Design a protein with these regions (language model features):
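Short helix-initiation/N-cap motifs at beta->coil->alpha
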Residues: 44-54, 153-157, 257-271
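Hinge/lid segment of periplasmic solute-binding proteins
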Residues: 74-132, 148, 204-217, 300, ...
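Conserved N-terminal structural module of periplasmic/extracytoplasmic solute-binding proteins
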Residues: 1-83, 92-103, 149, 427, ...
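Extracytoplasmic/periplasmic substrate-recognition and gating elements
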Residues: 3, 32, 144-145, 251, ...
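Long, aromatic- and glycine/proline-rich binding clefts that accommodate carbohydrate-like moieties
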Residues: 300, 304, 311-316, 324, ...
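Short amphipathic alpha-helical coupling segments at ligand-binding clamshell hinges
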Residues: 22, 26, 241-245, 339-352, ...
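Glycine-centered hinge/linker elements that transmit conformational signals in sensory
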Residues: 160-162, 198-259
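Paired acidic/hydrophobic, glycine-rich loop segments that form the ligand-binding mouth/hinge
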Residues: 66-69, 275-280
């Protein structure tokens, strides 16, 4: 089993907080009920890009973990390869570990189930971990400088100017290693900047509402159609505004941000050298227990972009980044069918997800809330992040998961060159547009969207 963030292990001398361990407890309890079952936990693999390489290599070789965890967006990119068991029929069966349950699916929040649905209508992943994001800030630095958490982008820029003038790094923003912080930032900024254009991008002319499902407002097929029609284009000044705002912000990220990875960014923040850090609910327990922290911290929402900062701003609030993308996006390998153990693996997953087991498991980790109907006993520190997601997440994907993996890498390289002045906006967007169109063509071919081709030719 590959459990990702839930992977249990012992605390080592280098740990500054307790690692998760509760899955060991559940495994022992399960073995009492099923003595013949052997449960082996694979070591956790980080960062995300290294895990992606490892897991795809394992599946290609027919060695994917019997029970694994993987983001729904990645699973739904690769489900046609036959790596995963369709969980939909099993979700219709009773969960024997939940009293009175007649249908396993009924214990999960509707958004969790909807998030896991693949383009073919089946479910190859059960995404049950609710995660939220926020901007963590050093209350002591804010007090010394005399600033308050901002509500608008203009205020955000102004407090960073003052913090920088006081001799601190305003924002620990990593651009080495995992692309998460850039991805989250552009998801939020793009959603606000393109707010007035989303109905045209979707192709319906109707308002695009926010839900708890990431990027649900604009499907990948709708995005590809908009690219082919020139509606979603890197050469559109409204689209370009997200890059301009990101570059404006980058002046406050401190020297060497291109070589700063997420661990180094966290260390800048926790040691008091940087005033802010954009991260997920996963940092709450870590910051609370890290003995390097010698200050009070708080969390605020990503600031709203207004007309004061951009002519394209509609004043819509910033969306949340998160949803059902935390620990516990469960997958079952198709090889379990050949091994004759698929029913046992599903049974073990039913045991894990029973509320009396899942809530303590989540609290032990302290990073995410399970996507269950019954959340009695969940750590109250996670509630603000849950509420932020309930208010709605971003409606359209950014560079990282919107198109192809190749496009994400190409975009990121060009973005770095733009932020550091090696390319101007025109040069950067010319190149991005070329890569964007290539990715759109590849997705049309890969997914067999002949109807889209016919529509474009009409």
């Amino acid at each position: 089993m590959y459990a990702g963030d839930y992977t249990p292990r012992e605390r080592t001398q280098s740990d500054r907080w307790d690692p998760p361990s509760y899955l060991n407890v559940l495994a022992q309890e399960y073995k009492k009920l099923h003595p013949h079952v052997t449960i082996e936990f694979l070591p956790e693999i980080t960062p995300q890009d290294r895990f992606d390489t490892w897991i795809f290599t394992q599946y290609q070789a027919g060695r994917g973990p019997d029970l694994g965890t993987q983001l729904f967006s990645e699973v739904n990119r690769h489900y046609l390869k036959g790596w995963y068991v369709n969980l939909k029929p099993y979700l219709e069966k009773p969960n024997p570990y939940v009293e009175g349950n007649k249908r396993w699916a009924d214990i999960f929040q509707p958004g969790a189930l909807a998030t896991g649905v693949a383009p073919d209508g089946n479910m190859y992943v059960l995404p049950t971990g609710v995660v939220g994001t926020g901007i963590y800030y050093n209350k002591d630095i804010f007090a010394r400088v005399g600033v308050e958490p901002p509500e608008t982008w203009a205020e955000f820029m102004e407090i960073q100017r003052k913090i920088q003038a006081a001799g601190y790094i305003p924002f620990a923003f990593p651009m080495a290693g995992a692309k998460a912080t850039t991805n989250w930032s552009l998801r939020v900024i793009q959603d606000m900047i393109l707010d007035s254009k989303l109905p045209e991008i979707k192709g319906t002319g109707e308002p695009v509402v926010r839900t708890m499902i990431e990027g649900e407002g604009i499907s990948q097929k709708e995005l590809v159609r908009a690219i082919k029609k020139g509606v979603y284009s890197a050469k559109d000044p409204q689209w370009q505004e997200q890059l301009r705002l990101l570059k404006e912000w980058s002046q406050y990220w401190g020297p060497g941000y291109l070589s700063l990875d997420p661990d180094a960014a966290y260390r800048l923040f926790v040691t008091g050298r940087a005033a802010m850090l954009y991260d997920t609910s996963a940092k709450i327990k870590v910051l609370e227990t890290d003995n390097l922290r010698q200050f009070e911290f708080g969390v605020f929402d990503f600031p709203r972009i207004t007309q004061e900062s951009s002519p394209y701003a509609t004043g819509v609030s910033a969306p949340a980044v998160g949803g059902y993308t935390g620990a516990g996006s469960w997958t079952v390998a198709a090889t379990t069918i050949e091994k004759g153990i698929v029913d046992q693996v599903i049974d073990w997953l039913m045991f894990i997800t029973a509320p009396q087991n899942y809530i303590p498991l989540a609290n032990d980790l302290g990073w995410y809330s399970p996507g269950l109907i019954d959340l009695e006993g969940i750590d109250p520190k996670l509630e603000p992040f849950i509420r932020s997601v309930e208010n709605g997440v971003f409606r359209i994907e950014s560079f990282y998961r919107g198109l192809t993996v190749e496009y994400a890498d190409q975009f990121y390289r060009v973005l770095q060159e733009y932020l550091t002045g090696r390319k101007n906006l025109e040069q950067a967007t010319d190149e991005i547009q070329r890569y964007m169109e290539q990715a759109a063509d590849e997705l049309i071919e890969r997914n067999g969207w002949t109807d889209l081709l016919a529509e474009l030719d009409a």
